[in-house]
Amino acid sequence: MNFKQNIVYKKMAISMKITAIRPIALVISFTLLSCKDKVKTVEQQDEPTKPNIVYILTDQWRGAALGYAGDPNVKTPHLDALAKEAVNFTNAVSVTPVCTPHRASLLTGKYPITTGMFLNDLYLPSEELCMAEIFKAEGYNTAYWGKWHLDGHRRSAYTPKERRQGFDYWKALECSHDYNKMPYYDNDNPEVKYWGKYSPFAIVEDANTYLEKQAKDDTPFLAVVSIATPHFPHGSAPQKYKDMYSPESLILNPNVSPKFEARSREELQGYYAHATATDEAIGLLLKQMDALGLNENTIVVFSSDHGEMMGANDVRPFQKQVAWDESIRVPFLIKYPGIDKQKGVTVNAPINTPDILPSLLGLSNIKIPDGIEGEDLSELIKNPDPEADREALVMNVAPFAGGYPNLPYRAIRTKQYTYARTTEGPSMFFDNVADPYQQNNLLGKPEFETLQNELDAKLNKKLAELGDEFKSRDYYLKKYNYVFGKNKPAIPYWEFNNGKGEVQSPIPVTQ
């Protein structure tokens, strides 16, 4: 029997995208009415309660830039408290560390090389089966707030309902980082509105109203709260929070280049200020969930789409795309119903962006549709093992904008090692336990040759499983018919306002 065939997710031209098969608890002849009633009773007894999901997605928040992760500067008391109640993946990575590719992979459970979503400002094909559509088919109410960055029709343009990939309640915008006057669209109203305060607090305030309404309803819900901080511009953080961080007093990591030290201190003041303000806003969201009694049956996730280099390893502030940990490693806390003894446990095995959707489906007892490429890690989440290990595949298919001078790469991250290869050969080999700031590249050292070969073989295996031929940037641009703009090596977008989006001019970056 086809999975939810009668549900139409989009317009008829792209309807019935789900083709995976889901077993029905019991099928019985409708002529046997008494038996039918009996089966209903069994279904009601055996059907597990569907958990709600609140997914908190931030932007450019480095995995190490939290109090619970050991950052000596930043103040994040509410997320520190959540970490004590959740499973903490210490080596969560972004499959392609930049906004649009991560978000597309998160919603589809697929790799950027498969969907073609490996650049910013691309159009996620409507035919792709996405997170909200799957949960909606299971009877979920779906809601989305904040930054979207998947429609590919100008960053300030209205996103019509058929382009929201299954999200019904909608207060979002394609892309803006004007935090003190952030525009958004209210559901099906095509007239732009503006959040009335610093956007993390405004978005959470509206989300809390939604949660209050949902708490009175038995319908399970999927709520994605997409907060665009602490992505630059950092100077726009509220002064109250900037006053908490004197640039001169900040402790810099030892891998920050001297030439970027002054700039990094200046930017970190605003970066940490955004982080602390966002932590406070998230605290209000978590407090509301507790007050409404939603904690007992809600999966809560806190994560980010990518990190940011902030002067580390000779890469200027604002830059990502590269394979160093400051760029690829992101926070990932997950709290789920019945967590009990697993509270505060850490998992050192990596979780990758495509793994998130199938893992949420696994935790929700929902059949994983065919075509999803990520791995269901729900058993590891429910039975966390700090000693477990696996390889996460990270890729930059076509470096663009500020990263344009770099070569494309493929890399694997394990709980201990990072190994990367560009189109010209091996480029990175770090022992992240012995060398947490990745300052000692082990490539070519005789004593590590065997290990390097093993990691190279594992990378080749991951590429083969995915069918990734690992070709040049131009090959993939031509394959997907992508054309960079004349003035910037990136997908053109319009109505670029000061303080919105990515850096405006490419600056050479060494990898």
From Swiss-Prot:
The modification 3-oxoalanine (Cys) is found at residue 99. One of its GO terms (molecular function) is metal ion binding. Gene3D superfamilies: 3.30.1120.10, Alkaline Phosphatase, subunit A. A lipid is attached at residue 35 (S-diacylglycerol cysteine). Binds 1 Ca(2+) ion per subunit. It comes from the Bacteria. It is an enzyme of class 3 (hydrolase). It holds the Pfam family Sulfatase. Ca(2+) binds at residues 59, 99, 305. One of its GO terms (cellular component) is plasma membrane. A lipid is attached at residue 35 (N-palmitoyl cysteine). It is found in: Cell membrane. Induction: By ulvan. It is a lipid-anchor. The active site is at 99 (nucleophile), 149. Residues 1-34 form the signal peptide. InterPro entries: Alkaline_phosphatase_core_sf, Sulfatase, Sulfatase_N. The conversion to 3-oxoalanine (also known as C-formylglycine, FGly), of a serine or cysteine residue in prokaryotes and of a cysteine residue in eukaryotes, is critical for catalytic activity. This post-translational modification is severely defective in multiple sulfatase deficiency (MSD). Keywords: Calcium, Cell membrane, Hydrolase, Lipoprotein, Membrane, Metal-binding, Palmitate, Signal. Sulfatase involved in ulvan degradation. Ulvan is the main polysaccharide component of the Ulvales (green seaweed) cell wall. It is composed of disaccharide building blocks comprising 3-sulfated rhamnose (Rha3S) linked to D-glucuronic acid (GlcA), L-iduronic acid (IduA), or D-xylose (Xyl). This is Ulvan-active sulfatase.
